[in-house]
């Protein structure tokens, strides 16, 4: 758990600043972390992230809940995988389902060949993940982020996770509206 890892870092390196750097899925976990424990760190860098899409994540959670009830928690649904990741390769000519991950074809090949990357996740994962996205983007939770916590957002204009920059801009705007001073 992220809170445990950061606590361990602070113990191992007393007096040092702790800057949390998170990418893609980790950036969503880190958004949750800063809502709960933001005062424990000195800054956060969210890379390849996205902002509030409450309708999309809410509907996705309902669908994943139905699929989970019908087929089981531990099953892996091609439907859910397609609904979540299916459009990410739109406009990219490639045989790889993971072409969206990087512009460098050699890196995509390494990703495809790595058994720890690109695997299908369970119905329960999708249900929990989409519920988490809904939760982290509720105003009452986002408002718990310390207003003096420096937040640095990075996004690529070719990254479908952040809707090619649009959703990251929504996150920026949301944080500014909440009164976070250094975004």
Question: PLM features: residue spans?
Answer:
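Conserved acidic catalytic loop of the alpha/beta-hydrolase fold
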Residues: 2-16
């Amino acid at each position: 758990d992220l809170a445990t890892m950061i606590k361990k870092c602070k113990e191992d390196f007393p007096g040092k600043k702790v800057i949390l750097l998170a990418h893609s899925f980790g950036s969503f976990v880190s958004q949750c972390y800063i809502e709960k424990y933001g005062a424990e760190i000195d800054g956060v860098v969210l890379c390849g992230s996205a902002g509030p899409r409450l309708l999309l994540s809410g509907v996705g959670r309902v669908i994943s809940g139905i699929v989970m009830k019908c087929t089981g928690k531990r099953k892996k649904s091609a439907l859910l995988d397609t609904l979540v990741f299916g459009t990410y390769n739109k406009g990219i000519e490639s045989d790889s389902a993971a072409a969206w991950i990087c512009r460098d074809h050699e890196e995509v090949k390494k990703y495809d060949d790595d058994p720890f990357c690109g695997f299908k996740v369970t119905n329960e994962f999708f249900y929990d993940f989409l519920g988490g996205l809904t939760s982290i983007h509720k105003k009452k939770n986002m408002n718990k982020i310390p207003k003096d916590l420096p937040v640095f957002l990075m996004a690529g204009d070719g990254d479908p996770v952040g809707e090619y920059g649009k959703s990251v801009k929504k996150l920026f705007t949301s944080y500014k509206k909440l009164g976070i001073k250094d975004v």
